[in-house]
Amino acid sequence: MTFSFEYRKFGDFTYNVLSDPTEIKSYLMKWIMREWELDHDEAPHEHWTVAWMEILPGMEFSLQVIQLDDIHPNADLMSVEDFQHSLEERADEREEAMLRGVSIEPLLVNGDGFELMDGYTRYTVLKRYTQKEVYAYVGTPGHV
């Protein structure tokens, strides 16, 4: 399956975005769910990953421009010292790539409370560069 990404400059960085809600959902189910499954295999005690895996399939998504300051990282995840250390290292590497013009995906945000579900490294770099608004795939409860 291929996806029809568009490349858009926004703020100081270039994003590779999907606009079609069905395509966004397919992309997230294929790639983000796989990433979370691997995370869960490595750290089954991390309850936030389980919660995200449970709600993702039932959500509908849209590409939105939102205020970066409105996004809330998961407090439990951010309290893990090893995660904080690795996040800073990954953010340093990602920052260099972004400054060299490498595009980034929109952040993945739960529209109910604006919890950051995916994109902690990108979020960290975007905060460093005081981006006011960012692209995000915002998820809301789907139709059951």
Sequence positions of predicted segments:
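Surface-exposed, charge/polar-rich loops and edge strands
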Residues: 2-62, 68-85, 132-144
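Short alpha-helix boundary/capping and kink motifs at helix termini
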Residues: 57-117
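A structural signal for short coil/turn segments at secondary-structure junctions
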Residues: 102, 129-130
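Glycine-centered loop/turn positions within well-structured domains
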Residues: 105, 123, 132
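A sequence-level detector for short glycine-anchored, His/Arg-bearing signature motifs
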Residues: 113-129
